Regions:
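His/Asp/Glu-enriched short active-site or ligand-binding loop at hydrolase and phosphoryl-transfer sites
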Residues: 18, 145-168
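Short coil/turn segments
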Residues: 10-11, 19-20, 36, 55-59, ...
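Short, glycine/charged-enriched secondary-structure capping and boundary segments
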Residues: 8-12, 29-31, 66-69, 90-91, ...
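A short, structured surface patch at a secondary-structure boundary
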Residues: 1-58, 62-63, 160-163
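Extracytoplasmic substrate-binding proteins
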Residues: 51, 62-140, 164-166
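Short secondary-structure boundary/capping segments
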Residues: 6-7, 24, 66, 122-123, ...
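Alpha-helical scaffold segments in soluble metabolic enzymes
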Residues: 4, 92, 153
Length: 168
């Protein structure tokens, strides 16, 4: 979501980001509210937000409920791990932040070109390619992308078979 906001030219609206927002590098200059799935009410309130925008994996739910009960608007975008899902996410974020329509159309057009190119390359794969997507977290212990992850969606969009698809 952070990357989309920057790509739309709406970064001046950001007051903080979560620790997974590491692109573009300018996002690192903003205060961090912690890990997207382990947010705290106090940490969020310390940034004085008027809107909290994120995907449906942010939480925990109790924190989001507390923030809403304090009158902070919450916009949750469903994460769909596909090319169409990415384009829909851009449209949602653009609408929520009131981005310039030309910026939104340009970003969607550029992404669609990349998705079309990816589709063409994927059609050239003649036998299944097994792959793993590993993330190196701060403690140095790698985490594998299972079936219910955005990493799995990336592998599928690339035409690859996730070797860890049996795990969520």
């Amino acid at each position: 979501v952070t990357e989309i906001i920057y790509a739309l030219g709406a970064e001046s609206q950001l007051v903080a980001v979560d620790t997974t927002s590491n692109f573009p590098s300018a996002a690192a200059d903003l205060p961090s509210v912690g890990y997207v799935r382990a947010l705290s009410t106090e940490g969020m309130l310390s940034t004085d937000p008027t809107l909290i925008l994120g995907e449906d994996d942010m939480g925990p739910p109790e924190v989001l409920s507390q923030l809403q009960s304090l009158g902070i608007e919450l916009s949750v975008i469903p994460e769909v791990w596909s090319g169409k899902g990415i384009l829909t996410k851009v449209e949602c974020v653009s609408s929520i932040v009131g981005a310039d329509r030309r910026a939104s159309d340009a970003l969607i057009g550029s992404l669609q070109e990349h998705l079309d190119e990816l589709s063409a390359r994927r059609s050239q794969i003649d036998k299944p390619i097994r792959a793993a997507l590993l993330l190196a977290l701060r403690d140095g212990v790698p985490t594998a992308a299972g079936s219910a992850t955005s990493g799995n969606g990336v592998l599928e969009m690339a035409g690859l078979t996730n070797v860890f698809a049996d795990f969520e």
